[in-house]
Amino acid sequence: MGNNMARILIVDDSPSQLLGIQRIVEKLGHEILTATDGAAGVEAAKAQLPDLVLMDVVMPNLNGFQATRTLARDASTKHIPVILVTTKDQDTDRMWGMRQGAKAYITKPFSEDELSEVLERVFSSQEPPTA
């Protein structure tokens, strides 16, 4: 996707975290969609079909691991890459997240450069959806 604008869904139950991530993503030139828990994130992804989802892990109603697994198993959303964004930094959490279908895992707090690098890596490795 390179420097092209992407539609990115940010899913986080913390208003301050959501705003902080939103500011970085907007500064990188992308369009923002938001949801405040895992269940709302799944619904937003199905309705809006974003180019990518930045998903917090610890949330009410459906945690980020569960929401990621739901998106990965749904025919309409399985092509959407999910990056887990969390304070959970154990290797076991990272491995579990990747097994649920996440394409990358970034721990909070992170810099604009770190997020930009992860977004670029995920977008450059993404295959175009097949019809």
Question: What label would you give each PLM region?
Answer:
Residues M5-S16, I21-V25, V53:
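Conserved acidic segment of CheY-like receiver
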Residues G29-T36, A44:
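Short hydrophobic/Thr-rich beta-strand motif most characteristic of the beta2 strand and flanking loop
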Residues A35-A39, R94:
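Conserved Asp/Asn-Gly motif in the active-site loop of CheY-like receiver
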Residues M59:
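Receiver (REC) domain active-site loop signature in two-component systems and cognate sites
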Residues K103:
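Short, glycine/charged-rich "phosphate-handling" switch motifs in NTP-dependent
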Residues F110-E120:
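C-terminal output helix
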